[in-house]
UniProtKB/Swiss-Prot annotation:
Cited Pfam families: TACO1_YebC_N, Transcrip_reg
Species annotation: Dehalococcoides mccartyi (strain ATCC BAA-2100 / JCM 16839 / KCTC 5957 / BAV1)
Lineage: Bacteria, Bacillati, Chloroflexota, Dehalococcoidia, Dehalococcoidales
GO-annotated cellular components: cytosol
Tagged with keyword S-adenosyl-L-methionine: no
Main location: cytoplasm
Protein name as annotated: Probable transcriptional regulatory protein DehaBAV1_0421
């Protein structure tokens, strides 16, 4: 798993997953609404809602917004119906791309994603085309500028983490989905500040790209994530850190 697309690290280095704070809060609200609708409004008995709330808090989303989203999901407040969809496609160089979308209009979302793939040198594919390349994993992000990365890596593995990846002052800790919350709590108990913790679709294998193709793929992934209806984007590209730095210096 080490050597995957490092997409969480790339987003961290960029400064934020979304260019607009308001757009980020909208996406977080949708996740909370959907989770509350699917599993009920109590975080104690709804792991997905618990994770969505923690992610919103990590992003400094106001507590009033969080409570309102929970009430919309439970039906206590009126709100639009949110549906979840997984869209699959290929980017430049045949890179596999998985898009997690949430919206109140599937046709609009599919149309927007298809347009962005086409514009970015890729194509939207049929269901099942690339999803088999990915598996769901917990990914815990930690800033490591003031930490002993070797010691932290050993701690994480001892706690049950499956793998770690360190790159330019940032560490990603990979866990089985059911273990993520437990490992996060153990790290926090030992004084480690968690930057993010979420379920990501991680590729089982990755592909190396030349610089030109990598730049095209990075742009496509960015543009897809900027769409209002897109929650997360995963790919099986393995980016050279120097190329990523060059891309962001030009973006």
């Amino acid at each position: 798993m080490s050597g995957h697309s490092k997409w969480a690290t790339i987003k961290h280095a960029k400064g934020a997953a979304d260019a607009k704070r308001g757009q980020l809060f909208t996406k977080l609200s949708r996740e909370i609404i959907f989770a509350a609708k699917q599993g009920g409004p109590s975080p104690e008995g709804n792991a997905r809602l618990r994770l969505a709330i923690q992610k919103a808090k990590d992003s400094r989303m106001p507590s009033d917004n969080i409570e309102r989203a929970i009430k919309k999901g439970s039906g206590e407040l009126e709100g639009t119906t949110v549906i979840e969809m997984i869209l699959e496609g290929y980017g430049p160089g045949g890179v596999a791309v998985l898009v997690n979308g949430m919206s109140d209009n599937r046709n609009r979302t599919v149309s927007d994603v298809r347009h962005m793939f086409s514009k970015g040198g890729g194509s939207l594919a049929e269901s099942g085309a690339v999803s088999w390349i990915f598996e769901a994993k917990g990914v815990i992000g930690v800033e490591t500028a003031r930490l002993d990365t070797d010691e932290l890596s050993l701690k994480a593995i001892d706690m049950g983490a499956e793998d770690v990846n360190t790159d330019e002052g940032y560490m990603e800790i990979y866990t089985a989905m059911p273990d993520m919350e437990k490992i996060r709590q153990q790290l926090e108990t030992q004084g480690v500040t968690i930057d993010s913790a979420e379920i990501n679709m991680v590729p089982k294998n990755t592909v190396k790209l030349d610089e030109e193709t990598a730049m095209q793929v990075l742009k496509l992934l960015d543009k897809l994530e900027e769409l209002d209806d897109v929650q997360t984007v995963s790919s099986n590209a393995d980016f050279d850190p120097e190329v990523v730095e060059k891309y962001h210096s030009q973006a």
